[in-house]
């Protein structure tokens, strides 16, 4: 009997096929809880193990060689400076000898001591004390200079009078009357002396100012050792922060060292400090002008400049917003630089003035978008359910169909009588590491970039531009054309709550994915594809797996914020259900998901069922007529026979089936794997789809043709594989068909490019896929996981379809259950 969900691990490591068929489908236990090394339950993209005796969150045994379980690496501590040590250095600096005699002559030791004794609170002398001291010193210096000047003047006059008298008394011909000084000559001589006196008076007037300049740079170190006063803890406002000179350098007594009033060095050290970036002065000697910031006129100039800039800058910004966007398509108000985007040509010829100034730079401003293709760029701030309709066209056409086997959108799809043939858009709007490894592989294991939460947090301010570029590049209109051409008719689109809002300290890129979701729905409409909405991540995380946004603890209906996140998830559905209840979505959004893969093996089952009922009633009250899906929560499908019996109308049960996360199924050889699908799964799905023996309408929302778990990051970032026995720490058990007999299984062939696949391997992969299509087609149908991947070829429908190991048309497979299983040639079982 069947072992049906990807969570089921009935077969485990059994090599005796008879045991498999002794198992019965109606076993009411969740048949997954033996503790044999090969019998641990595994799920897609995780290593969950569960103890049925409790509802505790799963215990994730992360590889300690990859991830340190301790806290993040501690920050490097700031250097601790010893205040007393610095003071001692300054004290020793005061004791260092000054080599220049001229400096010692100018030193006024007693005056310096008294000046330091009159410092104010800011560490400098009070203004009144400075004025008094300057006046006192100026007067004392002036008196001896006046006496010297008068003595020199008197001596010159006496010499002049003596010379004149000698000329009159002399009988020498050279001193005769013909050479006597005339009155004019005497007047000129007096004028010469008067000019000399005037120069001396000018020098006297200039002397106080020069003395003031010198005093500002007067050394505090004289012949006698003196100690510097301690520096204040905080530099007073307006006082320059002098560079503190190394005490060791001062103690060495370098002759070129000069010390300034606040601990800085003189000209000899200027070049060195300028290189260090800590010295802003321009003085070339002790008598140079003070720095510009100490000059009053510079303060006035700076003040005027500040006022002018305060006026000019805001005006320039406003003018650039109003007039600068015609020449700059990216927009000056854009929060993201999209100038390198190849997808904004639709802005050509448009004026940014069409966007109200209040909306410029916002999420509604197309000039901030990385991709404007196929959006209506006419501005509107209209919302439905609080969600914007910006980008949507006001008209639509529902007359399209993807192929002649299905009705057009404006006619009802015959659910129940015709199977869904669809694909998922995993890894696009809800990022998943194994689908887009390029976003994760450049980080080291120490960074622990393991999900969208940690990725966005690491990216910081560049998260929006990086993530939106992924949105624009990963899926395009051509993908929907290819889906139609591949014979598909439905698309399950993953998105998460941050498309609508974010909470608390969420690092997610908020709201940008919303417009990409809306455009994807319009592409589906254009090519006749119906849509299944799939909220892949809801507040708090419903399963603690990386594809919910954040790997770790389950915070939805569980833990401290369990009830808060319960309400937040209902608020989320209240908004999006109002939006998608609009008439424009009635024909295209035909399936409405509530939450992807809630881990009911850990969560209280009744709480999940009650929330499911409340959410379904809420969205249907808001006008949703689409089928509402509830996931099986990884419980045994037989249990669902008795669950939600009084549920609202128009509901689907959603089950996800994989063989590679079940250690009892991954060890099956190629032929037995096809038999498992056609014998066990076929009957299981057929039965659960009935209301008499099962639950009722059931879809398979996820499955794949992957036959190994070898894809990079499939089992979480940094984890190994079951296929090669590197999955779990301390457990090297290998789960593959030749584990016991050899040869050794390898991921090399499974991860090889599809061009290297042998014909036998391609035949197996296509038969394996078509067997699952046949089994799930007995119910409401299927959605392949997933349409596109960067490198995981066995998980990409597009890659398989283009490389010849998927049917050319999904509705025309080569194999169906009941047919003879074809030969796969000499295909080895170890890959």
Curated annotation (Swiss-Prot):
GO terms for molecular function: glucan exo-1,3-beta-glucosidase activity. InterPro entries: Glyco_hydro_5 (IPR001547), Glycoside_hydrolase_SF (IPR017853), Glycosyl_hydrolase_5 (IPR050386). It comes from the Eukaryota. GO terms for biological process: cell wall organization; glucan catabolic process. The gene is exgD. Residues 1-297 are cytoplasmic. Pfam families: Cellulase. Belongs to the glycosyl hydrolase 5 (cellulase A) family. Glycans are attached at residues 376, 381, 393, 410, 442, 546, 558, 610, 636, 669, 689. It catalyses: Successive hydrolysis of beta-D-glucose units from the non-reducing ends of (1->3)-beta-D-glucans, releasing alpha-glucose. The chain crosses the membrane at residues 298-318. The keyword Lyase does not apply. Residues 319-831 are extracellular. It is an enzyme of class 3 (hydrolase). Keywords: Carbohydrate metabolism, Cell membrane, Cell wall biogenesis/degradation, Glycoprotein, Glycosidase, Hydrolase, Membrane, Polysaccharide degradation, Signal-anchor, Transmembrane, Transmembrane helix. One of its GO terms (cellular component) is cell surface. Residues 1-179, 192-241 are annotated as: Disordered. This is Probable glucan 1,3-beta-glucosidase D. Residues 1-24, 44-56, 79-93, 102-115, 137-151, 198-213 have a biased composition (Basic and acidic residues). It is a single-pass type II membrane protein. The active site is at residues 597, 702. SUPFAM superfamilies: (Trans)glycosidases.
């Amino acid at each position: 009997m069947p072992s049906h969900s990807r969570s089921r691990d009935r077969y485990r490591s059994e090599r005796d096929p008879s045991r498999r068929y002794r198992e019965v489908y109606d076993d009411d236990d969740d048949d997954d809880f033996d503790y044999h090394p090969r019998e641990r339950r595994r799920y897609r993209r995780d290593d969950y193990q569960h103890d049925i005796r409790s509802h505790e969150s799963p215990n994730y045994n992360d590889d300690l060689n990859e991830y340190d379980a301790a806290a993040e690496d501690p920050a490097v501590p700031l250097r601790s400076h010893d205040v007393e040590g610095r003071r001692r250095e300054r004290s020793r600096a005061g004791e260092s000898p000054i080599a220049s005699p001229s400096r010692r002559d100018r030193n006024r030791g007693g005056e310096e001591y008294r000046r330091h004794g009159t410092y104010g609170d800011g560490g400098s002398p009070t203004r009144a004390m400075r004025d008094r001291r300057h006046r006192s010193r100026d007067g004392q210096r002036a008196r001896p200079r006046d006496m010297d000047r008068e003595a020199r003047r008197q001596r010159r006059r006496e010499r002049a009078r003596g010379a004149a008298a000698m000329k009159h008394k002399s009988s020498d011909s050279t001193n005769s009357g013909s050479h006597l000084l005339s009155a004019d000559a005497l007047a000129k001589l007096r004028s010469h002396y008067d000019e000399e006196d005037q120069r001396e008076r000018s020098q006297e007037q200039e002397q106080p100012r020069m003395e003031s300049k010198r005093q500002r740079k007067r050394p505090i170190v004289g012949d006698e050792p003196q100690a510097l006063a301690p520096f204040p803890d905080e530099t007073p406002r307006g006082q320059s922060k002098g560079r503190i000179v190394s005490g060791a350098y001062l103690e060495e007594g370098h002759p070129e060292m000069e010390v300034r009033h606040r601990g800085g060095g003189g000209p000899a050290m200027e070049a060195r400090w300028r290189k260090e970036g800590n010295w802003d002065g321009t003085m070339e000697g002790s008598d140079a002008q003070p720095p510009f910031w100490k000059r009053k006129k510079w303060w006035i100039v700076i003040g005027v400049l500040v006022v002018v800039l305060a006026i000019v800058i805001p005006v320039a910004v406003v003018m650039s917003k109003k007039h600068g966007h015609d020449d700059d398509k990216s927009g000056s108000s854009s929060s993201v630089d999209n100038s390198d985007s190849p997808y904004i040509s639709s802005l050509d010829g448009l004026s940014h003035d069409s966007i109200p100034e209040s909306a410029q730079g916002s999420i509604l401003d197309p000039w901030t978008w990385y991709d404007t293709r196929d959006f209506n760029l006419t501005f509107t701030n209209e919302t439905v359910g609080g969600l914007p309709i910006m980008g949507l066209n006001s008209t639509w056409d529902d007359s399209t169909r993807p192929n002649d086997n299905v009705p057009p959108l404006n006619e009802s799809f015959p659910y129940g009588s015709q199977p869904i043939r669809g694909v998922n858009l995993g890894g696009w709007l809800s990022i998943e590491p194994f689908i887009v490894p390029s976003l994760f592989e450049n980080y080291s294991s120490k960074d622990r970039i393991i999900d969208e939460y940690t990725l966005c947090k690491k990216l910081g301010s560049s998260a929006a531009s990086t993530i939106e570029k992924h949105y624009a590049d990963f899926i395009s209109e051509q993908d929907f054309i290819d889906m139609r051409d591949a014979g598909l008719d439905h698309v399950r689109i993953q998105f998460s709550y941050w498309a609508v809002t974010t909470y608390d300290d969420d690092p997610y890129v908020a709201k940008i994915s919303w417009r990409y979701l809306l455009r994807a729905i319009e592409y589906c409409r254009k090519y006749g594809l119906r849509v299944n909405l799939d909220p892949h991540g809801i507040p708090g995380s419903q399963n603690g797996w990386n594809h919910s946004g954040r790997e770790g603890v389950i915070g939805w209906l569980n833990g401290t914020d369990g009830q808060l996140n319960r309400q937040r998830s209902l608020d989320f559905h209240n908004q999006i259900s109002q939006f998608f209840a609009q008439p424009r979505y009635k024909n295209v959004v035909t399936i409405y998901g509530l939450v992807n893969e809630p881990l009911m093996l850990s969560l209280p089952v009744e709480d999940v069922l009650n929330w499911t009922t409340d959410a379904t009633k809420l969205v249907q009250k808001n006008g949703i007529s689409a089928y509402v899906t509830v996931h099986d929560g990884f419980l045994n499908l037989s249990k669902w026979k008795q669950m939600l019996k009084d549920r609202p109308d128009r509901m689907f049960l959603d089950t996800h089936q994989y063989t590679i996360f079940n250690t009892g199924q991954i060890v099956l050889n190629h032929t037995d794997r096809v038999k498992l699908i056609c014998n066990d799964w076929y009957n299981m799905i057929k039965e659960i789809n009935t209301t008499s023996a099962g639950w009722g309408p059931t879809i398979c929302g996820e499955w794949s043709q992957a036959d190994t778990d070898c894809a990079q990051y499939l089992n979480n970032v940094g984890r190994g594989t079951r296929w090669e026995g590197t999955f779990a720490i301390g457990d090297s058990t290998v789960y593959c068909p030749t584990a016991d007999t050899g040869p050794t299984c390898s991921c090399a062939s499974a991860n090889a490019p599809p061009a290297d696949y042998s014909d036998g391997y391609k035949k197996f992969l296509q038969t394996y896929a078509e067997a699952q299509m046949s089994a799930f087609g007995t119910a409401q149908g299927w959605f392949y996981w997933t349409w596109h991947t960067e490198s995981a070829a066995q998980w990409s429908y597009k890659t398989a379809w283009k490389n010849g190991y998927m049917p050319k048309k999904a509705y025309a497979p080569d194999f169906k259950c009941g047919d003879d299983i074809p030969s796969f040639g000499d295909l080895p079982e170890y890959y």
